[in-house]
Amino acid sequence: MYKKITLILTCVLCLALVGVSCKKKEQTEKKHTLTEAEMTKAVKDFIQQAEKSVRDGKADFLNNAVDTVALKAAVEKKGSALDLGAGMEIFHGNCAFGDYLCAIEESGGSFRFDTTYVKNGLHHVVLRTYDGNGNFQFEDLQIGFRNGKALIQDAFLYSITSNLSDKIASESTLNVFMTIDNPTEDARNMIMATALCANGEYGKMWKLLNEQRANLQQFTSFYKFYTIGLHECSTDFAGDLEALGADMRFNLYHQLCHAIRTGNAEAAMQHISQLIDYTGDDPIYWVLYAKALTNAKQYQEALAAYNTAKQGMDYIWDIWTGELTCYKRLRDTETFNNCLQAGKFLYGLSDDEIADMGRNF
């Protein structure tokens, strides 16, 4: 009887302890639930730390600011091949935001966190990049929170109308198909399109992608190669773009690229105005507008646009070379030479490098 009572008391005590433990756990979890104001502050802190670390040439903060657990779960939902071939290498390569932004800075480009917003309870940060070759991108970062800190959980990539998780899933799957003897017909066609693009055979690539569009849109790289073909081969740019039925941000991004390339400054400004509704304002838009004006041979107007850009951002390489192009086309030799010499203190160029640049223009 005594043993029975002791056993009962022990069980009661255990249950009580479990109850206390659960209660403490609940209190701890409640304690770590962030308010909207705290989440907003965490996002602001994330942006400030990211900017400072990249300016200091340090990639670690942003490389570690990805919620790899959440991103991997999103990738695996899409039936990827992360555990096969180079799957995990592809995954980690796409997560290296710090390396990515540091490389852009080192190339003479720039980046900017343009705007933040909250939609359906999810925090977003729009990142703009502009590399040393004049390529610009917008990425809508989807932010989650862990231990009070903001982390990147996924991102919408304007240029390919896909989430980062879709891109990783598609790339890892296609990578496996490239290593086996009998890939699916769709994978073979996508591999062929990749090879045609690498060889500069845009016409053949464009024909293949249009013929197989319904089957190949499962691969995010389809949008990359399709838009290359669109810019190189299409006789109805707007119509072919709309036919994809893609996200409006993708459409506006590529319409702007097309307007810049063809020197349609009026259309460029129209698309910029529409994109600002999604990205927030950014002085890089003045650089892009200046490029459209330059291609339209409106050099004085382009110089004015570059000057406006400089008031809101660093004097990046493309602004400098853009101004040099305008002065050269205007045959303003004196101002051209003065601007050229500025390359010594702006970018640390030697006399020989300055002389080479002068000859190239």
For each feature predicted by the language model, list its residue ranges.
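Short, low-complexity N-terminal intrinsically disordered segments enriched in polar/charged residues
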Residues: 22-56, 180-189
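Generic helix N-cap/helix-start motif at coil->alpha-helix transitions
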Residues: 41-43, 120-122, 135, 181-190, ...
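Surface-exposed, charged secondary-structure patches
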Residues: 83-133, 242-249, 276
